[in-house]
């Protein structure tokens, strides 16, 4: 959903002032020094970082504002890395903002801090559009991960996923003064701070207001007054107390303040168990099954977190399934309501658009055209629906906007008598080249090995000897086949600590996925030859099908949807269907009627789910969960039910359907974060929507199993 941006004025000193709160964003005298003193030194960050042994240190902030606190933190963290080059932990910075600055105001505000010029440029380049939810950014070659949650803090914090060990190691309790912004400084905020706090979590804040001190103490923090910065006499700082009680309360209230759905069914809350994060070996061996867009995105996400990956796939080369089409449209599927599916699609698209552009800037090549996507209102009812979607202002204009026929014609560079929706960040991509680019990018960060002609027969867990120690590992069994020239030598057996199924349409051959209601859908795309009128097309057109601009003398026109058909042979009957759909949808465009087929194209099988959303998370042990959660239909209190059993360190990323280009990068990042124990870049509600065991839970509630 669209977030209202901040109303900003700049004073004579160039300091930004929030008109609605009548308060400055930072001190006009020395805002950077105040940030370093209040938040970094009073949280003892330099000292704690020297001794930190965990893989991640998490800072959480209650008001992002101009990003000054982040920039100061980056500067101090870089000093730490220079002085302690053996330090290996990742710094994770989570912040919230109800009224984000516009891009223009952010640039002007940060002009005052030339000492942070490089990091400020990196922030400005990644700064998100005003879209409600979590936006992930990275700095210092992935050593610092930033999650910026846009929206009301009282809505955001209950959606942060944590386990019984907590999430946050240090709080920056910032924001406008309590007297200016009393809605934020509430008991609910302090309770959430305590819920999310890890053992030893500290906090610091510039204010010394009495009700803030009392609220923090009531929530479970030890609080003390300390000397303030500059002209401010006092400030507050402290540490989480009552470790045992906090742990117990957090364990008993894992679904803290979940809203209306908590009383309706147990579907979402039980699904949340599949995002449990367990400790792994310091250097685990990772096996990814599948080498399409899901497998490549997974390898890249894991490589960014320092994992080496072995990729096993059936074919001679990667991207031979649905990811092998020469052209594919890239755009989000948005609705007139902010459903979970719409939110997932919107955030997935924004994340993917940023990632693909970053790959380009880093020198990884894949054919593409960021020409935008025009979704045509080729029927009156559709045109009306699209107009309502933009009139509601549900989605930011940077994401989608309504265009009249005249502008549509200008964007498409051809006759276009239809209004529609234009998505400027979209376009088309060569998926197979993108898959190669993702594997290449992953290989620059860690060790990535590709094993072709490896059709998985199954996995089993055994104790194996590793460096004179016994360790439980998965053994992967493959069908024997001949090695392919240029690829790694084939073996019939491999070992891994972590197994990730990113198997797409081949999921139907995986025994471990047999109990999941995956749907296989055949699709055929035409490669139609260009001609004079068609060659002018300058954007992707979507109607009941789609048509791309010219690439290598051809246009992609598609696509059919044939359920439960695993054949990939080319069919003239489906060519006729694709052409007929195109002619009918663009019946008022003469140039569109001149498009002809040439019996060239490609068919592949997509893997989808009944609710058209991916399956992302730990792989449920279906038979055990059927027994453990058999009483779900009774709708008893959550504390009654045990934690559902999952396969040990086995995960799944599949069911992307025809939206793999859009959803794969963020889904892979979510799963990689779960595996590595890092904060998850998605709200609990949305995580629950993606959980692989959601279908089983629904069946148990309905007593269908």
UniProtKB/Swiss-Prot annotation:
Keyword Transport on this protein?
A: no
What is one GO cellular-component annotation here? cytoplasm
MF terms from GO for this chain are:
flavin adenine dinucleotide binding; oxidoreductase activity, acting on the CH-NH group of donors; tRNA (5-methylaminomethyl-2-thiouridylate)(34)-methyltransferase activity
Region (FAD-dependent cmnm(5)s(2)U34 oxidoreductase) residue ranges read 289-705
Look up the EC number in the record and give it: 2.1.1.61, 1.5.-.-
Cofactor needs: FAD
Check the record and name the InterPro entries matching this protein.
FAD-dep_OxRdtase, FAD/NAD-bd_sf, MnmC-like_methylTransf, SAM-dependent_MTases_sf, tRNA_MAMT_biosynth_bifunc_MnmC, tRNA_MNMC2, tRNA_S-uridine_synth_MnmC_C
UniProt catalytic activity: 5-aminomethyl-2-thiouridine(34) in tRNA + S-adenosyl-L-methionine = 5-methylaminomethyl-2-thiouridine(34) in tRNA + S-adenosyl-L-homocysteine + H(+)
Q: Which keywords fit this entry according to its UniProt record?
A: Cytoplasm, FAD, Flavoprotein, Methyltransferase, Multifunctional enzyme, Oxidoreductase, S-adenosyl-L-methionine, Transferase, tRNA processing
Q: Where in the cell is it found?
A: Cytoplasm
Region named tRNA (mnm(5)s(2)U34)-methyltransferase = 1-241
Q: Name one GO biological process term.
A: tRNA wobble base modification
**Described purpose of this protein according to its UniProt entry:** Catalyzes the last two steps in the biosynthesis of 5-methylaminomethyl-2-thiouridine (mnm(5)s(2)U) at the wobble position (U34) in tRNA. Catalyzes the FAD-dependent demodification of cmnm(5)s(2)U34 to nm(5)s(2)U34, followed by the transfer of a methyl group from S-adenosyl-L-methionine to nm(5)s(2)U34, to form mnm(5)s(2)U34.
Q: What is the similarity comment for this entry? A: In the N-terminal section; belongs to the methyltransferase superfamily. tRNA (mnm(5)s(2)U34)-methyltransferase family.
Q: What is this protein called?
A: tRNA 5-methylaminomethyl-2-thiouridine biosynthesis bifunctional protein MnmC
Biological source species: Pseudoalteromonas atlantica (strain T6c / ATCC BAA-1087)
């Amino acid at each position: 959903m669209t977030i209202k941006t901040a109303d900003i004025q700049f004073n004579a000193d160039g300091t930004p002032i929030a008109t609605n709160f009548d308060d400055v964003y930072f001190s006009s005298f020395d805002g950077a020094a105040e940030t370093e003193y209040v938040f970094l030194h009073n949280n003892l960050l330099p000292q704690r970082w020297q001794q930190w042994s965990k893989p991640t240190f998490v800072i959480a902030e209650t008001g992002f504002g101009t990003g000054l606190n982040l920039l100061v933190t980056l500067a101090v963290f870089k000093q730490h890395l220079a002085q302690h080059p053996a330090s290996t932990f990742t710094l994770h910075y989570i912040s919230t903002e109800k009224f984000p600055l516009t891009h223009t105001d952010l640039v002007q505000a940060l002009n005052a801090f030339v000492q942070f010029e490089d990091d400020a440029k990196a922030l400005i380049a990644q700064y998100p559009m005003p879209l409600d939810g979590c936006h992930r950014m990275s700095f210092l070659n992935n050593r610092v991960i930033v999650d910026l949650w846009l929206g009301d803090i009282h809505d955001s914090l209950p959606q942060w996923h944590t386990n019984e060990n907590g999430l946050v190691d240090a709080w920056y309790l910032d924001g406008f003064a309590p007297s200016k912004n009393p809605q934020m400084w509430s008991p609910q905020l302090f309770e959430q701070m305590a819920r999310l706090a890890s053992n030893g979590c500290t906090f610091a804040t510039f204010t010394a207001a009495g009700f803030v001190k009392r609220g923090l103490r009531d929530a479970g923090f030890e609080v003390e007054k300390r000397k303030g910065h500059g002209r401010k006499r006092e400030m507050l700082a402290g540490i989480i107390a009552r470790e045992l009680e906090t742990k117990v309360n957090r364990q008993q209230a894992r679904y803290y303040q979940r809203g209306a759905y908590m009383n309706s069914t147990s579907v979402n809350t039980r699904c949340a168990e599949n995002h449990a994060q367990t400790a792994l070996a310091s250097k685990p061996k990772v096996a990814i099954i599948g080498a399409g867009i899901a497998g490549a995105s997974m390898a890249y996400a894991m490589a960014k977190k320092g994992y080496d990956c072995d990729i096993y796939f059936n074919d001679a080369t990667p991207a031979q399934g649905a990811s092998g089409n020469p052209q594919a449209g890239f755009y989000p599927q948005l609705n007139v309501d902010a459903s979970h599916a719409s939110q997932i699609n919107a955030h997935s698209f924004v994340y993917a658009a940023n990632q693909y552009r970053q790959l380009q800037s880093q020198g990884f090549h894949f054919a593409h055209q960021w020409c935008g996507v025009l979704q045509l209102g080729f029927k009156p009812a559709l045109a009306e629906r699209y107009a309502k979607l933009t009139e509601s202002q549900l989605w930011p204009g940077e994401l989608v906007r309504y265009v009249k026929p005249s502008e549509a014609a200008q964007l498409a560079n051809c006759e276009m008598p239809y209004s529609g929706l234009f998505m400027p960040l979209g376009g088309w991509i060569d998926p197979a080249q993108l898959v190669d680019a993702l594997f290449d990018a992953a290989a620059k960060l860690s060790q990535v090995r590709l094993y072709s002609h490896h059709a998985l027969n199954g996995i089993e867990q055994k104790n194996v000897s590793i460096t004179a120690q016994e360790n439980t590992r998965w053994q992967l069994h493959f069908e024997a086949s001949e090695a392919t020239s240029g690829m790694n030598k084939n073996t019939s057996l491999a070992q891994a600590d972590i197994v990730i199924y990113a198997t797409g349409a081949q999921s139907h051959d995986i025994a471990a996925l047999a109990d999941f209601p995956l749907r296989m859908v055949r699709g055929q795309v035409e490669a139609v030859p260009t001609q004079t009128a068609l060659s002018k097309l300058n954007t992707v057109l979507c109607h009941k099908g789609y048509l791309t601009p010219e690439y290598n003398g051809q246009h992609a026109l598609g696509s059919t949807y044939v359920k439960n058909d695993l054949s990939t042979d080319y069919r003239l009957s489906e060519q006729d269907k694709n052409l007929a759909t195109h002619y009918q949808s663009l019946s008022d465009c003469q140039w569109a009627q001149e498009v002809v087929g040439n019996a060239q194209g490609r068919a592949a099988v997509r893997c989808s789910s009944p609710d058209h959303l991916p399956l992302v998370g730990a792989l449920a042990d279906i038979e055990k969960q059927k027994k453990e959660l058999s009483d779900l239909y009774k709708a008893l209190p959550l504390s009654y039910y045990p934690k559902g059993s999952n396969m040990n360190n086995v995960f799944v990323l599949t069911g992307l359907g025809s939206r793999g280009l859009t959803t794969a990068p963020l889904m892979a990042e979510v799963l990689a974060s779960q595996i590595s124990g890092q904060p998850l870049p998605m709200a609990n509600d949305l995580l629950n929507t993606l959980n692989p065991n959601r279908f089983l839970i629904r069946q148990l509630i309905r007593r269908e199993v």
